Regions:
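Generic detector of well-ordered alpha-helical segments enriched in charged/polar residues
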Residues: 3, 27-31, 70, 217, ...
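Eukaryotic helix-linker segments that join adjacent hydrophobic helices
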Residues: 1-7
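Conserved phosphate-binding/catalytic region of the ribokinase-like
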Residues: 39-49, 62-65, 96-233
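Alpha-helix termination/capping residues and helix-transition junctions
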Residues: 8-11, 76-77, 116-117
Length: 233
């Protein structure tokens, strides 16, 4: 379908794919993509050819499936993965009886989950009102970025779509910044904050280029000025 939509030459140059699907479906899609891009994902590559941003389906986030997820990620050593369940899904993957409710508990959980993926990959946990936590394998540290509406919770109307949109914004920031996890996490939280301000999709003004009355730059600048001091390692 992607080849028909974009054409093979363009698709072969696409380096980032966001997947929201099961383990089996993810494996099949990755294998199909690599055939089109003409490289073996089970072999180490001399240059980065494909990054998969994997948002697992909620129903596969069970402790019994963690070894299978681990096997899939570690089996495709020629691909970079950004694995991103939310905090509730992460807790089920690790066999917790309940979802962590504090930032410190989420940090501990993120480190534990990261231990189950190969060292060249990132683990991004979406923690709702607590923001996002990313394990940076290169710096060997956690990066916490607060939720966009930390100071304005009264503006949150409907959280539906916040997680999906976070990863869309994260992917955009990650690509534009050439892999800067801090920038990507900020973009993810900014976009997610916009999505949850109403029921349904945000109001788009094509003339002013605003979502719910604010441009992306205005939202980005607001986030930087209000939350950047909260970055924690």
């Amino acid at each position: 379908d992607w080849v028909e939509c974009f054409g093979k030459p363009i698709f072969q140059n696409i380096g980032y794919i966001h997947l929201v699907c099961s383990i089996e479906r993810s494996k099949q899609i990755i294998e199909d993509i690599c055939k089109i891009k003409n490289f073996d994902p089970t072999q180490i590559q001399t240059e980065e050819k494909l990054t998969i941003i994997w948002e697992p389906l909620p129903d596969i986030c069970q402790a019994d499936n963690l070894p299978v997820i681990n096997e899939l990620i570690q089996g495709f050593i020629g691909i970079k993965f950004i694995f991103s369940p939310n905090s509730e899904e992460s807790s089920r993957l690790l066999g917790y009886e309940q979802e962590p409710s504090s930032l410190e508990e989420c940090k501990i959980m993120t480190k534990k989950l990261y231990c189950n993926i190969k060292s060249t990959d990132h683990c991004v946990i979406r923690c709702g009102r607590l923001g996002s936590i990313t394990y940076d394998y290169e710096a060997k540290k956690l990066l916490h970025m607060p939720a966009y509406h930390t100071f304005t919770p009264q503006k949150v109307v409907d959280p539906t779509g916040g997680g999906n949109s976070f990863l869309g914004g994260f992917a955009m920031g990650y690509i534009l910044s050439h892999g800067d996890l801090k920038y990507a996490s900020i973009c993810g939280n900014v976009v997610s904050g916009c999505i949850i301000e109403q029921i349904g999709i945000p109001q788009w003004d094509a003339t002013k280029k605003t979502w719910n009355g604010h441009t992306f730059k205005e939202r980005f600048d607001y986030y930087i000025s209000n939350y950047i001091k909260f970055e924690e390692s």
